[in-house]
Amino acid sequence: MTDTNELFEDQTTALQNSAPIAPLANPQHTVSRGKFRSLTLINWNGFFARTFDLDELVTTLSGGNGAGKSTTMAGFVTALIPDLTLLNFRNTTEAGSTSSSRDKGLYGKLKAGVCYAVLESLNSRGQRVITGVRLQQVAGRDKKVDIRSFSLQNVPMSDSIISILTEQVGEKARVLPLADLKDKFDGSEVLFKQYHSITDYHSFMFDLGVIPKRLRSSADRSKFYKLIEASLYGGISSVITKSLRDYLLPENTGVRQAFQDMESALRENRMTLEAIKVTQSDRDMFKRLITESTNYVSADYMRNANERRGNVQIALEQRRAWYESKSKLELEQQRLIEFSREVADISENESSLEAEYNSANDHLNLVMNALRHQEKIERYQNEVAELNEKLEEQQIALEEVSEQVETAQARADDADDQVEELRSQMADYQQALDAQQTRALQYQQAIAALEKAKQLCGLPHLDLHNVEDYHAEFAAQADDLTDQVFELEQRLSVSDMAKTQFEKAYELVCKISGEIDRSEAWNEARSLLTAFTDQKMQATQAVALRQKLADLEQRLHQQQNAERLLAEFNQKAQTQFETAEELEGYFEQQQARLEDVEAELAEFVEVRSTQRQQREQLNQQYNQLAKTAPAWHTAQSALARLEEQCGEKFEASQSVMQFMQNMLTKEREATLARDELARREAALDAQITRLSQPDGSDDVRLNQLAERFGGVLLSELYDDVSIDDAPYFSALYGEARHAIVVRDLESVKAQLEKLDDCPTDLYLIEGDPSAFDDAVFTAEELAEGVVVKVSDRQWRYSKFPEVPLFGRAAREKHLETLKAERDEVSEQHAERAFDVQKCQRLHQHLSQFVGTHLSLAFQPNPEEQMQEIAAERTEIERELNQAAGNEQQLRSQLDSAKAKLQMLNKILPLVSLLEDETLADRAEECRAQLDEAEEDEQFVRQFGNYLTQLEPIAASLKSDPAKFEQLEQDYRQAKAEQKQVQQKVFALSDVIQRRVHFSYEEAIGSEGSALTEQLRTRLENAQREREQARDQLRQAQAQFTQYNQVLTGLRSSCDAKTQMLQELIREIDDLGVRGDIGAEERARSRRDELQQRLSQQRSRKGYLDKQLGTIEAEIDNLTRTLRKAERDYHTQRELVVQAKVSWCLVLKLSRNSDVEKRLNRRELAYQSAEELRSISDKALGALRTAVADNEYLRDSLRASEDSRKPENKVAFFIAVYQHLRERIRQDIIKTDDPIDAIEQMEIELSRLTNELTSREKKLAISAESVANILRKTIQREQNRILQLNQGLQNIAFGQVKGVRLVVNIRDTHAILLNALSNGREEHKDLFDSQKLSFSEALAMLYKRVNPHIEMGQRTPQTIGEELLDYRNYLDLEVETFRGADGWMRAESSALSTGEAIGTGMSILLMVVQSWEEESRRMRAKDILPSRLLFLDEAARLDATSINTLFELCERLDMQLLIAAPENISPERGTTYKLVRKITNNQEYVHVVGLKGFGQQ
């Protein structure tokens, strides 16, 4: 046994003799421990719905065999650990069996249907927690049970568990399935949760303080179940005692994990260094294989792409030629049909045109004959007209002379009457000589006149009053008679001449109308003369009517011509125009169309010339760009790689230069950040190293001094305080927190003078390290710190530190934070170091790019420009081809439009005639009017001269000269009546004139004399005028005779001319044609027009016949060309389709494998096929050598040499790519692209080599530090076990008076610790070896210092990992103090059954308490977990032992559930009497609960 074990024994002896250790800290607030309140069983065997209220200390189930005690405990255990892999409820019938029943003892305890086992607990927070399981038998031979765990929270205290899990159905109750239970609480405050894993269920129970330890794995659950099982069946469990270390000693996962992390980091570091060396050797191979395979495949790839593009272009050209031939053939066939149709139409129209031409020629001859007759007629008509004019002039002159004769005769008669009247007046006025005589005479004459008037008028009552009325009456009669007499005088005055005129007029009338009665001559003459006026008017209109008829006939002919032209136009234009508006609109449209077509045609010609120039320019630009494109693509590839490396999109050369400058700045900043992070990482490593020490001290001299003084660091004594208490104790001791606790200060004082190396301030505290308390200070805790009363006059206030030194939990918590921060800083440092390397590499690439490709990289894409140029060129070619077709089409449209306009120009002037539907009627009407007018004209020509002669003498026909005597008698009678009436008028007027004479009788005599003289003068004048009138009458009569003779000569000449004219008119009437102005021109124009049309038709027919022959020959040629073009196109298309299938496979392979951008090297597209084959062949030779050692790549390369399957080359490239990708070390290079991997290798290799070398030095584990950590951990756990022993001091069962745990360090491991601490130089070969890990070195050292131990088949690594666990250094045993034997190892064979049960229960209580302490850091501060153990068959304990258990439960605040026979009735706790009964064939357990009667 080592010194350490002896020290432990001494400490144990001292502990037994010392008082109990005071608590480490007095908590300010007491937290109550959680308790199990009840157990509810639903539908179990004997328990349909039973709730057992659990006592706060001991609950006893009392009953006979088969009463249901084990069933109740099984329900509790099942609800606590619902793991079917662990549950195994044994009974006494299986005492000697090696295996239990299939159902693990659970199937038979359940009834059919839904069953529940539910635990109700009340935790430290006062929360009601309901946890349980739903069980259900599964039908089958295996007797399986289905278990579902669940929990309920926020259930009111008033709700019982049974009411929750069942519902009342009439007088019976129904157990709710789990789904209905869930639905029952949906939408309510009650939280129902079903668990699909046991780990989640136990995590919930741990968080709420139902179980003492977090059960993270099945191993933890197994330990917990074994603990329960050992408690249930009692005794000292060998399973637990043999593995007591696993139950009592917590696993120091932090330390072991730290060792493992360091070791794995070192291992990974060394592996990475090896991988770097391998990668360095792979880099050249990567470059060579990638370069050659890329050249080999991409050259063939681009050659196939070029050939495919060329084949497609050839196919397109052949298809275009095929379509052009097809369209030409269709066009020629259409022309053949149109020309054939036109020839047929011309043949049909030719015969009708010939007939029309002959008819027009005959009509022209008739018109010319008619015109010759018309000229003669016009000449005779002119002569007759001149003679008629002369006759009319002579007749007018004769009439004027006749009028002069009549006027002269009337003047002579008037002159005679005036002379006679003046003579009678003068005779009357000679009778008055003087005035009186005259007055008297006048008076007498007035009276006489009045009497005379009375006598003449027969008016005896005549007087001065009514004389005027009678005068007016007789004056009117005198006027009528005067007119009558004047007429008769006129008739009588011309009676001699009238007789001659009558005879002549009668003769003329008889010539015109034939023989008629003389008495009817006047009426006939008057009617002839009346009609003659209209006839002359009609005769004058004959010329106009003839012109009008000619115009109408011309217009009618034009209308017929227009209808014919319109029909031809509609036929040619495929229209149905009828109205003028439609034709005019179409004319304007066609005229506009003609202008547009002409403008468009001119524009086409100009544009075509411009396009040809553009095509030449584009060809020059294309050739220039084609020369530049390969270099541009190379620059673009470099730019793409540069942008991919930089992660930046460069838009211009300035951006590249700016990025270079930014990269330099970024490199400087990254270097500074890297150095700063390196310093931070070193500081964190130092801090982590310090906190990783067991005592948390940053001064190693304190540990040495503590060992020298035989004391313990104060921080080690408080290493087990909780996270919450650690700040308090750190503040409580202040600067003395680094003190050393020694047993005797006086013994240490002597050694202080001998110290040569110690801290500036060294604090020493006297006390027992194994029983130390904090009674040194008087302290008061505040909100943010602690006030410590050092003395009456000195207080110290210390704030709670953020990182307390005390408490392993607090240090580990902060250590986790520091490690996370260290890892983060380390990662940042690696990132910054990588950034520095990357910046340097990028700057190098940027410099190369600027020097080589900058001038071209940012130029516009020549391929895009070439595509644009090619598109423009293609577009220009297409436009030129289309322009040629369009030009031909436009010229055709132009000719068509011109022809249409030419026809429309002929039609439009006649368009008004088309709508004149009355033209034919008006022509007929005009022809009828012309016939009438010509008849009148003929009548005027024949009888106009007679009527002209008749007109002036027609009045002579009124009186026949044979009645002259009667006329003369009538004249005399009228004269006598006139004279008589004049006498009466004269007598009355004389009375009226003499009215004044009745009033006076005298007058002045001088007046009469003057009147006489006046009358004499007037008489002389009248006589002179009479002589003059007689002379004028004689002259007029002589002139009348002369004019009459001239008129007779002219009339005879006119009659001869008129007779000749009538003969000519009859001849022209026989011809049936009217010759007028323009008739010959119209007839000749009509004939010439028909002749021209006939000539044009014949010429057109001859041209069409020639064209038909040419077109038929052209159709034959085009048919042969079309067949050949179709065959060539289909052949080429099959070639394209075959190439497309292969090309699609190539594209599919390249795109699916993401290698298309590697193969599609556009700079190779401008090289010829021979050049590309040369590149591919050179690369093939290099690849054959490169892949000679790789069978897979060699076979793939051999398959790729088949030129008929280009996809095999892509498959080879993919194989190479995949092969290289698999060779990439992902732990070094973060990419799967071999191209990028090469680039990243350049960046990573140098950085990783330096960094990993320095990292390996940092990660090196010190053997001395490992030994120190293990010693401190072992010492801490020994102290903890000593504290646990205090709880077992007063335990007594039978002869056993005490129980304790003994911890010893194994000798072999103690030797190992000494070797680690002291043999640094001796065992340097193991720990400095690069080939051995620290675990392996530790295992080799263990073997070296313990050569007698056999390692077996285990590896050094496994042994080394076990040696890093402090639990393997300790032996833990249970000892009992029994009678005279003293302390001895606890074994069942040396103890009675009751003593073994009590001892085992004590051990289990220690385990539970240890678990609580272990899990205290992971549990909430306000939670103390429930403590409950089981004990079946408690009858083997006597009353004293039972009371001891009760006392132990009370002291440890633990609940106990025991099963006892009926004769056991504890005085304390709660007892349930269970009796199984059968009623009405139904078995059930009758339960009666009793409170302990001894309880106060």
Curated annotation (Swiss-Prot):
GO biological process terms on file: cell division; chromosome condensation; chromosome segregation; DNA replication
Q: Which residues bind ATP?
A: 63-70
Q: List every stretch annotated Disordered.
A: 1082-1101
Fetch the InterPro entries from UniProt. Answer: MukB (IPR012090), MukB/SMC (IPR050308), MukB_hinge (IPR032520), MukB_hinge_sf (IPR042501), MukB_N_dom (IPR007406), P-loop_NTPase (IPR027417)
Can you say where in the cell this protein is located? Cytoplasm, Nucleoid
Biased composition regions of type Basic and acidic residues, renumbered to the chain: 1082-1091
Coarse class of the protein's main subcellular location:
cytoplasm
Cellular component per GO, a single term: cytoplasm
Which molecular function terms from Gene Ontology are attached? ATP binding; DNA binding
Record's keyword terms, sorted: ATP-binding, Cell cycle, Cell division, Chromosome partition, Coiled coil, Cytoplasm, DNA condensation, DNA-binding, Nucleotide-binding
Any Pfam family the entry gives: MukB_hinge
Which parts of the sequence are annotated with region: Flexible hinge?
A: 694-811
Q: Kindly list any coiled-coil regions of this protein.
A: 328-493, 536-632, 808-832, 861-1171, 1235-1291
Family membership noted in the UniProt record:
Belongs to the SMC family. MukB subfamily.
Q: How does it assemble?
A: Homodimerization via its hinge domain. Binds to DNA via its C-terminal region. Interacts, and probably forms a ternary complex, with MukE and MukF via its C-terminal region. The complex formation is stimulated by calcium or magnesium. Interacts with tubulin-related protein FtsZ.
Q: What does this protein do?
A: Plays a central role in chromosome condensation, segregation and cell cycle progression. Functions as a homodimer, which is essential for chromosome partition. Involved in negative DNA supercoiling in vivo, and by this means organize and compact chromosomes. May achieve or facilitate chromosome segregation by condensation DNA from both sides of a centrally located replisome during cell division.
UniProt note: domains:
The hinge domain, which separates the large intramolecular coiled coil regions, allows the homodimerization, forming a V-shaped homodimer.
Protein name in UniProt = Chromosome partition protein MukB
Upper lineage ranks? Bacteria, Pseudomonadati, Pseudomonadota, Gammaproteobacteria, Pasteurellales
